Amino acid sequence: MITEPSLTGISGMVNRNRLSGLPDQPSSHSFTPVTLYDGFNYNLSSDHINTVVAAPENSVFIREEEEEEDPADDFDFSDAVLGYISQMLNEEDMDDKVCMLQESLDLEAAERSLYEAIGKKYPPSPERNLAFAERNSENLDRVVPGNYTGGDCIGFGNGGIKPLSSGFTLDFRNPQSCSSILSVPQSNGLITIYGDGIDESSKNNRENHQSVWLFRREIEEANRFNPEENELIVNFREENCVSKARKNSSRDEICVEEERSSKLPAVFGEDILRSDVVDKILVHVPGGESMKEFNALRDVLKKGVEKKKASDAQGGKRRARGRGRGRGRGGGGGQNGKKEVVDLRSLLIHCAQAVAADDRRCAGQLLKQIRLHSTPFGDGNQRLAHCFANGLEARLAGTGSQIYKGIVSKPRSAAAVLKAHQLFLACCPFRKLSYFITNKTIRDLVGNSQRVHVIDFGILYGFQWPTLIHRFSMYGSPKVRITGIEFPQPGFRPAQRVEETGQRLAAYAKLFGVPFEYKAIAKKWDAIQLEDLDIDRDEITVVNCLYRAENLHDESVKVESCRDTVLNLIGKINPDLFVFGIVNGAYNAPFFVTRFREALFHFSSIFDMLETIVPREDEERMFLEMEVFGREALNVIACEGWERVERPETYKQWHVRAMRSGLVQVPFDPSIMKTSLHKVHTFYHKDFVIDQDNRWLLQGWKGRTVMALSVWKPESKA
């Protein structure tokens, strides 16, 4: 969970972001390099690339119309969700939005840090949730030193507060600049600090340094709540308040209210589906334009795979001829061309053991050796070693929590996250297979019923539901009610993103003529009560939770495990069906070396899968490796306690938890399993593994289980 060579696109490839016939979109996203604390960089900056994921050599490309099966099954398993993602990418402000999951997981961390800075106990009181701009002058005076009257001005960079030369202008859009007049937003105006620096004749330097530290912490934490990439822009000229922009106790109340409204501008709803793209949104209906484009893309991928295979064969012949010439010369001329072979996994494990033993000298030497042979632009092992070395270095320096907070506080474009998710769907069957099985199981359960209520824990962007809505329109249109549950977002609109997901889904339901109702819940999952869900016993009730339960804390953090609390709530809901998908991992152990080893094995499978299927130059692959999986690895390695939010367990551990909650596991429909296996073996790499164990559907890569899916019912309905 980072001097970069120039990267070139693969000529002749089509842009996968144009799969659904929508208007042209930017084909790449940029990464802003940020250097954090120890000097190494966790972010990428690359040229614009237009690439398509290269299918593996063993993939088979078969048209849907050649199979004697229900074409609707092909629709469900095809990239139906890509049309939904493409529509989201066409929304005007998607590039400016930050990732929903990123914000929700860090809100609690931000609250805790603010309370630690002022010496109060968490959890916060309601008034504490206000942004930094709403603090009163008394609280601000306790944070800002009162004797800023001396020499240099202060700049706020990634490394903390730094003295800068005079003459710069401090702008919150550019935190590393500074001026001799420092203005900080406050509830009744701007409090202004005049002078050229800090008075060295302070009577109490210790108190002064503490105030500086507190001020730095408050600025860093407050920036997380500022809209649009931490920019806080207050336009007093438009509000006719220029003359009152300084601290003034006699300013007008009207001007106060106008200034407050300008600090955090209200976000007004927009048309989720604009008129120029409504006609082009097709959810990959068999025979439709989107399916034709999908088949054309498969043809292009097939040609690319054949070309790559031929190129690899020619390269092997050249290497064989080179070895033959070397032997003919007696082997003396080939020594300089040999590359040093390094077992990066062993080095990483030995380094983790040294870090756990606090052997800094040995750990430093091993880290230096790992850095020498790892790179974010090499093969899969080198990229994996680079990510894990970042985590080890942060843990060794004792700055893991600060570095992780610094990374997650940097906004990630929601468009970039969607494009990366689009790539993951294209190259890996895990989530697509889960969507297909879940939707097919729900449809079979609903049958001819007139009403269905889906409660989705961790709905995020609602990727899986457009296909279900479309299928309901094909085989009867029951009233669909979806309750989308997400963690709250920071700011004054904690439910904004989950509400936007509902608006998109409502637009799809209207497009296909399906009666639809949506309710958004933005709360901590363990704080949700049964009354919040509006259960109607006359409806078919389905609870869905796919691959998000790992972010709930367990008994090692909280005596009353959040995981058991949520499962007990699901038992009280008494659903007709509970679909449960988990990330299968054993790296939730309290002992660091054990956790590190298991995390290394888990992420090795993912990085090897990407190395086998996706070209190294692909931008979205780099984003997945560094910004998604690399960030998760950093959290697992460098963070402890409540700050460690990546806590997956094995499917056997989750099985025990679910049974303790009064749930009974039921088998999958054999016909669904048969269709799923056929699809995976037909359209995906041969090294993807689909298996069953104790009624769990196991999905993995080269024999290692990565994800698991199961279906449960209450004891009363089993």
UniProtKB/Swiss-Prot annotation:
Q: Where is the composition biased (Basic residues)?
A: 316-328
Q: Which residues form the GRAS domain?
A: 335-713
* Tissues expressing this chain: Expressed in cotyledons, leaves and flowers, and in the elongation zone in root.
Q: Which Pfam families match?
A: GRAS
Which GO molecular function annotation, any one, does this entry have?
Answer: DNA-binding transcription factor activity
Cell compartments where the protein resides: Nucleus
Region called Leucine repeat II (LRII), residue ranges:
500-532
Please give the InterPro entries that the UniProt record associates with this protein: TF_GRAS
- Recorded superkingdom: Eukaryota
Chief location: nucleus
Q: Which Gene Ontology BP terms does the record give?
A: regulation of DNA-templated transcription
Similarity annotation: Belongs to the GRAS family.
Q: What is this protein called?
A: Scarecrow-like protein 9
Q: Which organism is it from?
A: Arabidopsis thaliana (Mouse-ear cress)
